[in-house]
Amino acid sequence: MTLPIVAIIGRPNVGKSTLVNRLAGDQQAIVHDEPGITRDRTYRPAFWQDRDFQVVDTGGLVFDDDTEFLPLIREQAMTALAEAHAAIFVVDGQTGPTPADEEIANWLRSQSVPIILAVNKCESVEQGLIQASEFWQLGLGEPYPISSIHGSGTGELLDKLIIYLPTTESLSETNEIKVAIVGRPNVGKSSLLNALTGENRAIVSPISGTTRDAIDMVVQRNEQQYRLIDTAGIRRKKNVEYGAEFFSINRAFKAIRRADVVLFVIDALDGITDQDLKLAGRISDEGRATVLVINKWDAVDKDSYTIYEYQKMLESRLYFMDWAEMIFVSALTGKRVEKILDLVDNATASHRRRVSTAVINEVLQEATTWHSPPTTRQGKQGKIYYGTQIKSEPPTITLFVNDPKRFNDNYRRYIERQFRQQLGFTGTPIRLIWRGKSTREVERTTNRATRV
């Protein structure tokens, strides 16, 4: 369902990300003692009483600084407010009202969105009431003293907030596809997100490491909803300092795990690097459906054979991910970007697909007829009794055999290829579990599965 949005607004370092973590009940927003740590607007699901909603974590709002990132952060905060049902304006109770708070308050009073004033860092009830009273002067109504770290006062804040939010029953269900956009730094992930959504949703800058959080954007195409997750660029461990980037990379790995499909973005000018190979291995290990997005194709000098040569190189270097579909695009010009979601749809369908035991065993029957299982040096031949799919996402098939050790890697790859070719598992990894089973055990289960 499309959840109502609550924007968290405030100047830098008043505890906005800590409040988001408190409301969302997790530690996803990066909290670290470095100014301006939240750059993009990031969405987190939250719940209170009978209301489901999203809290939007924005960068620290500053109106009088022209350094490179701050104007971009202002734009992101303003966009978050424009799409919100309500906003929480966070101030620092320990410092009292500042000129920056007054400037933000003046701007907020001109907006049509309901504003709730949260006075953070009020660590005691008595002192908090005194601290909060100083903020009446901002002209935004009653100040609510809270402690984001300890949670005190947040219940009263949320009671006020949900007055402005629709109930869960009034929200329509959607079959959402979660898509993580993953790759090395500066391969064009944020530009791709912007091209897919048609707005400057993620900050695009030539500075490496612009995207620090895994940030979400929900887009609709026809009847299908997609949650696009832009992630921080993933570098070699030895190049990552402990701090915000360290946390961001861990967040990117979590984004891979929660995604239905990964858009693995590769720089066409760099080709496949060692770091790309390691990242591809991580995606494959997590069992995620994948689309290989070769970006910056507009910058490549090419002739009529270039794309075929590049495809061969990709298939050679990423041989363990040969099941992934690939597309050559330019996020900068938008060329072929609109076709990416078609591949996402195909990969999702394969990733979620379930096949009956009867069909699986028909494939096995034909496969073993054309190519018999191997025989050991001692003359003992492998035998596949039957197979059954035990789960999807990714599709996982258990094969019951007389002895798993009798099936070498070549034959296992052959069986996997047969499943892919005959059952259409494109864009997703599949898992085959080879399980030993005696003839007597097979006979006891013959009423539950078709034997081969």
From Swiss-Prot:
GTP 1 binds at residues 10-17, 57-61, 120-123. The gene is der. Belongs to the TRAFAC class TrmE-Era-EngA-EngB-Septin-like GTPase superfamily. EngA (Der) GTPase family. SUPFAM superfamilies: P-loop containing nucleoside triphosphate hydrolases. Disulfide bonds: none annotated. Residues 4-169, 177-352 form the EngA-type G domain. Residues 353-438 form the KH-like domain. GO terms for molecular function: ATP hydrolysis activity; GTP binding; ribosome binding. Associates with the 50S ribosomal subunit. GTPase that plays an essential role in the late steps of ribosome biogenesis. Transmembrane segments: none annotated. It holds the Pfam family KH_dom-like. Keywords: GTP-binding, Nucleotide-binding, Repeat, Ribosome biogenesis. GO terms for biological process: ribosome biogenesis. This is GTPase Der. GTP 2 binds at residues 183-190, 230-234, 295-298. It comes from Gloeothece citriformis (strain PCC 7424) (Cyanothece sp. (strain PCC 7424)).
